Each structure stands twice: as structure tokens, then as C-alpha cells.
Amino acid sequence: MRNACTRARLTRTARAMVKTLFIAIASVTFFFTSDLALPQSAAAYPFWAQQTYPETPREPTGRIVCANCHLAAKPTEVEVPQSVLPDTVFKAVVKIPYDTSVQQVGADGSKVGLNVGAVLMLPEGFKIAPEDRIPEELKEEIGDVYFQPYGEDKDNIVIVGPLPGEQYQEIVFPVLSPNPANDKNIHFGKYSVHVGGNRGRGQVYPTGEKSNNNLYSAAATGTISKIAKQEGEDGSVKYLVDIKTESGEVVSDTIPAGPELIVSEGQAVTAGDALTNNPNVGGFGQLDAEIVLQDANRVGWLIAFVALVMLAQVMLVLKKKQVEKVQAAEMNF
């Protein structure tokens, strides 16, 4: 009887272990295959930089890490005030221009509209203004944009996106300036602002693999012996390009749906030659700006100084005219 109970417990324990192991394997499999199954989000959204580089999106060289996946260079603009007073709300405008008539390659190879994203690196102490501090007029300019801090303790670094590019080629950030009177770590002076903006999907995943929004090249030198189209159970399409080398070895290049093949069977190619066009129409751009946290007292003293200088000039002019009148009177006498 005791042996039977022991065997029953062992059986239940074994089943539980097998179930746990199965769940663990399924979770790991989903984690590593999600980038392949859903590549569009992996390449297009700024939060991938947040997950891959959790400390800061800016490398020691000054390069913003979004450029590691978005390889093409495109212009990005930013508008910030030259100076701001403490504890005030102002707007920073990031402009991500592009030709809205073009379309990008989607994850399934179809043509879709471009999306945009941005990262705004503000000085320490600056952050997105609370809802109750944003004027109604500024709220209308912002629209339905959601601002996400880069980390729990990184309110001064803000990421936005993905957003539909046709509606958000200009992204308005409502920024609240810090008050040195309340935080001794904040000081008046000039600070740097770093901005990055991308439009369209990236060419490389954070894992280093190419997306289907990229150019594909030959892996070997030889003659293209076969080009075969394959369709997966999920409807995905890919092409296998077989290259036969001089030694008789066959090297296969896998090309996902999206890039257009520019080679044909029987064509001789060299390793590195393009097999497809480059479908990318987007790109990333970054730039730096400066903003001054101005002391209101200094502004007041500056105004007083300017007023004093102007008053002194007026007095000098009046004194000069008075002297001229006296000299003229003496000459007449």
C-alpha cells in the first residue's frame, strides 16, 4: 500500500516536472522566434532601442543607437526655445520630413505607409509636463501622442512611436523646465539637447539579422542554377536562390518577400553581388541643439542695466544740448 502511494506521488511529480519543462521550452521558443514571426514591429519601433540599450540611447561617440538598425541617413529637425525660465512649460518640435507618396515594404512583403518615431534627450531635470500643466492650445498641437520615458529614473529621455507618418511629420513635446530653487542639483546655464528621428522600418533587427527591408547579396561566386519560390503554412513567401560554385558545391541564399530579385537563372555572380534591389525608402537622422535655463533675477537685473544705460545716454544728450545753449548764449553776449 505504501509503495503504491509512493509510486503515485512520483508519477504526479514527474508529470508536473514534464509540464513545467514544456511550458519553459514553449516560452523560450516564443521569445526567440517572435522576432522572425513578427518582424515589422522589431524593426520599426523605438522601444527596441530601449530594450537593447537600457542605460542610454546615446553612445559615447554621440551616435544615437537607432542608427544601428536604421542604416540610411535622412534629415531630422528640431525647434526649441533659445532660453526658458524655471518651472515653465514650453514645446520642443521634432520634424521628420519625407516624401509621403512613397511606400515601404511591410513584414509580409506588401507595400504599406511609413511610420515615424523619435527620441528626445533633454538635460537632467527637464521632463514631459504633467497633464494639468499643459495649456489647452498646446494640447491641440500634441494630439494623441503618447510619451514614454526611457526608464523609471530617466524622465528626461523620451521616446515616441510608432506613429502614422502622414499625420505626424511634426511631433510636439510639452516640456517642463526644472527649478533650481527646489533642486540643488540643477543649475542655471546652457545645456545640450539631443534628438533622433526615424521614418520607416529598419534594415537590421536588434539581433543583427537582416529584415526584408534590405538589400540581399550573393553568398558565393558561381552561377545561379535555380530560383525557387516557397510558401509557408502561414502564407509567408520566400525565395531560394541556388548558386553553383566552380567546385560543384551549391550555396543557397534565402530571400524573404519584399526585395525584388534582379537576377535570373544561369546568370554568373560574384560573392557580394546584389541579388535584389534595395527596397528601403526610410532612414534615421539626429542632431543636437542648445537651450539656456535662465535665471529670472538675472533677466530683471539685465533689464534694469539696459534701462540705466539708456537713461544715461538720454541724460548725456540733454546735458550736451544744455552746454551748447550756454556756449551759444556766451558767444551772443
UniProtKB/Swiss-Prot annotation:
GO molecular function, one term: heme binding
InterPro entries, per the entry: Cyt-f_TM, Cyt_f, Cyt_f_lg_dom, Cyt_f_lg_dom_sf, Rudment_hybrid_motif
Topology in membrane: Single-pass membrane protein
Leader sequence residues: 1-44
GO cellular component, one term: plasma membrane-derived thylakoid membrane
Major place of residence: membrane
Keyword terms of this UniProt record: Electron transport, Heme, Iron, Membrane, Metal-binding, Photosynthesis, Signal, Thylakoid, Transmembrane, Transmembrane helix, Transport
Entry cofactors: heme
NCBIfam families: PRK02693.1
Family: Belongs to the cytochrome f family.
Quaternary data: The 4 large subunits of the cytochrome b6-f complex are cytochrome b6, subunit IV (17 kDa polypeptide, PetD), cytochrome f and the Rieske protein, while the 4 small subunits are PetG, PetL, PetM and PetN. The complex functions as a dimer.
Name listed for the protein in its UniProt record: Cytochrome f
